[in-house]
Curated annotation (Swiss-Prot):
Organism the protein comes from: Geobacillus stearothermophilus (Bacillus stearothermophilus)
Protein name, UniProt field: Uncharacterized protein in gldA 5'region
One Gene Ontology molecular-function label: protein kinase activity
Superkingdom: Bacteria
Stored Pfam families: AAA_PrkA
Amino acid sequence: MDILKKIEKHREMEERLKWEGTFAEYLEILKEKPWIAQSAHSRVYNMIKDAGIEEINGRKRYKFFNQEIFGLDEALERLVEEYFHPAAKRLDVRKRI
């Protein structure tokens, strides 16, 4: 796919996601779909978790990273469990990394 087609596809996607409304309408949407108001950390954690987790010898292996990162399972487990998981719960994580 050439760059112009990618740009056009991105613009079309942005246009589909565009929404305008009142704050009251937004609150009504949140009643039906509360996940819309997730924090960025929560979205990232859920994305990693939803890709799947394998437990091997008591260690968690996140399938999200299977095709991209090799040999860093322990570091990734620490990153996800000690940073993204608490941050998704809105806990203070400033001194964790």
